[in-house]
Regions:
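Glycine-rich FAD pyrophosphate-binding loop
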Residues: 22-43
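Conserved FAD-binding catalytic core of PHBH/FMO-like flavoproteins
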Residues: 111, 118-268, 273
Length: 390
């Protein structure tokens, strides 16, 4: 087989890149190690920057997003028993975020790809990337007991933190930066109305909590737990009790409890790999960087990577210029590091760190108090939360 761009990974970044390229007549084949059902079953992020929404619109995949997504003009920080609202729209000249689950984004993009007849090969194994340091890269993989080969012009590694793409970088060519946090997020999905119409980020002596949502009838809640905690130790009753303890009284009283239909613990880490380009192989999204979910940046960073890579590929296929591709890694990493900083800052401000003790708690309290009473500080948070410019 031959295609112009081989895309490794059928998550949102791979699908989005494929749709954008299809719109300018560039052919792609996507290879995915999991089944279609497994990809659609992943529960992930739910807050989209306006730039991500715009890019999905450019890809022709924002119809349901515009109809069902929930525009949010603010968030609340909860501490000292009270809610303190940050007016994102007023502080950023009219910008906002949209709540729409990553599962839905994936579904929309997958439907568009399938309707167009573009090729995605699911349940592949032994994917290997070859000769991307030259002009004729190719990819091999196994499927149904046979080995297959795809010749291509470029390879886009959109296969996440555990994928083959980053591991294929030449030995010694990759530099990584990592911070692992001593806690995780225990999250539940429940078919109950949210406690607040906007997201609530709570700093509490028992640990962080987040009130979020996927729709007006579906809520997503999280509580900070130790890194070695086991999800089996948490009944629904225990979770709801702990969540309400960490929220201000009025917010806690507004929590509607019910059976969870998804419950999991996610570790928190900051991770960046540099560079994001190796010849004709480009790393995209979680293949190159991971951020703690506190700043709602993971999916949005993947989308901004796609935006930069799409621009470079469009320039190459229309003008045979490599200038955009040559600039990809530096442009992407400049935005990545700002989001890594913001996500780290939100995480350190809102979570309990076992090693910092009472001093750390007082520093957090002082920072939060300054933040909500300073327009300059609130503006800095709002600008980062709605998404920095490309």
């Amino acid at each position: 087989m031959r295609t112009q761009v081989a895309i490794i990974g059928s998550g949102p970044s791979g699908l989005l890149l494929g749709q954008l390229l299809a719109g300018i007549g560039v052919e792609t084949i996507i290879l995915e190690r999991s089944s279609r059902e497994h990809v659609l079953g992943r529960v992930r992020a739910g807050v989209l920057e306006q730039g991500t929404v715009d890019l999905l619109g450019e890809a022709g995949a924002a119809g349901r997003l515009h109809a069902e997504g929930l525009p949010h003009s603010g968030i609340s920080l909860a501490f000292d028993g009270r809610l303190h609202r940050i007016d994102l729209t007023a502080l950023t000249g009219g910008r906002h975020v949209t709540v729409y689950g990553q599962t839905e984004v994936t579904h929309d993009l997958m439907d568009k790809r399938e309707a167009a007849g573009s090729v995605t090969v699911y349940e592949t194994s032994k994917v290997a990337l070859h000769d991307f340091d030259g002009a004729s890269p190719f990819v091999t993989y196994d499927k149904d007991g046979a080995t297959h080969r795809i010749d291509c012009d470029f390879i886009a590694g959109c296969d996440g933190y555990h994928g083959v793409s980053r591991r294929s970088a030449p030995e010694g060519a990759l530099k990584t930066f990592e911070r692992q946090y001593p806690f995780g997020w225990l999250g539940v999905l429940a078919q109950v109305p949210p406690a607040d119409p906007e997201l609530v980020y709570a700093n509490h002596e028992r640990g962080f909590a987040l009130c979020s949502m996927r729709s007006p009838q579906r809520s997503r809640y999280y509580v900070q737990v130790p890194a070695d905690e086991r999800v089996e130790a948490w009944s629904d009753e225990r979770f709801w009790d702990e969540l309400r303890r960490r929220l201000p009284p009025r917010t806690a009283a507004a929590v509607t409890t019910g059976p969870s239909f998804e419950k999991s613990i996610a570790p928190l880490r900051s991770f960046v790999a540099e560079p994001m380009r190796f010849g004709r192989l480009f790393l995209v999204g979680d293949a190159a960087h991971i951020v703690p979910p506190t700043g709602a940046k993971g999916l949005n960073l993947a989308a901004s990577d796609v935006r930069y890579l799409f621009a470079g590929l469009r320039e190459f296929f229309s003008d045979r210029s490599q200038a955009g591709l040559d600039a990809y890694s530096a442009k992407a990493l400049a935005r990545v590091w700002k989001a890594v900083r913001f996500s780290w800052w939100m995480t350190t401000m809102l979570h309990r760190f076992p090693e910092t003790g009472e001093f750390g708690q007082r520093i957090q309290e002082a920072e939060l108090d300054y933040l909500v009473h300073s327009k300059a500080a609130s503006t800095a948070l709002a600008e980062n939360y709605v998404g920095l410019p490309y």
